[in-house]
Amino acid sequence: MLNILSITAPIYLSISTGYVATRSGFFSKLDMQVFGRFVLNFALPAMLFNALSLRDFQDVLHPSYLLAYALGSVMTFAIGFAVWRYGRRENLTLSALAGMGVSCSNSGYVGYPILLQILGPEAGVGMALTLLVENLVIIPLGISLADSGEAQHASWQHTVLASFMRLLKIPMLWAIVGGFVFSMMGWHLSEMLFKTVNLFALTCVGIALFVNGGSLVGMRVVGQMQSVAWMALFKLCLHPALVGLMLWTFGGMDVSLQIAGVLLASMPMMGIYPILGQRHGQEGFCAAALLVTTVASFFSISLLLWGLSQVPAWRVATGG
């Protein structure tokens, strides 16, 4: 168990450092937003491009993984949506936000740093494929349904199109596309450009964790504990269980990729979740869910890592 804590403890200590630095006033919430934009628009895209472009194409394109992760995530989304919509009698917008929250992980800020310690350079491939599913399937689905709940005059086709148009402005997606193209064509950056991109990629992990902690400052859970507890349970337990089931059902992929899928699904929800909720006046609910899920994930991820470490295939995939 100490080996597991040696993986998770540095991650959450880094998150705590960001929280304390922001809470004490050393940095402001506005500073965290600037750092966050740097990670999302420069550091993370650079890391994703390197992870894909430096490998053979057959090593980075895994249709079975994409399909398995997408199915597991959509199933989780559907269950979360149904529970809030029909079980808790919530409106369409909040139900859609709940579905998105329980099925879309914080892959870049928390997932990648953990995977990097376990799988090494292979972590980037699993994360890039997961980000494709999240950004092309789960987030557009959630945003479209949430917008539909407040824009009865607009057709769902218009809402979906608007969501995809917003996605075209995300540098991460272009980095993934560029990485796939370079890998497929066998292209390589010049040494000067490679070193430049790599400098940005190396800044990703520490700043991402620091920002994740700083973003938690000011979030409140008062009066919403029951709702967000269900969110945490679905995100940290149901999502990895369904993704793991789909990965096992499809099979035919490297064990390290299966481990990456289960671990990424077990991460807390994405850091921009409260921002997405703010567009619909639900930032309080989304922020509370993010806070509780992030804190609880230290224990759930540590337990999951311990369980996976007992499986013989884990030692083969991780070399440990």
Indicate where each model-derived feature is located.
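Alpha-helical transmembrane segments of multi-pass small-molecule/ion transporters
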Residues: 1-320
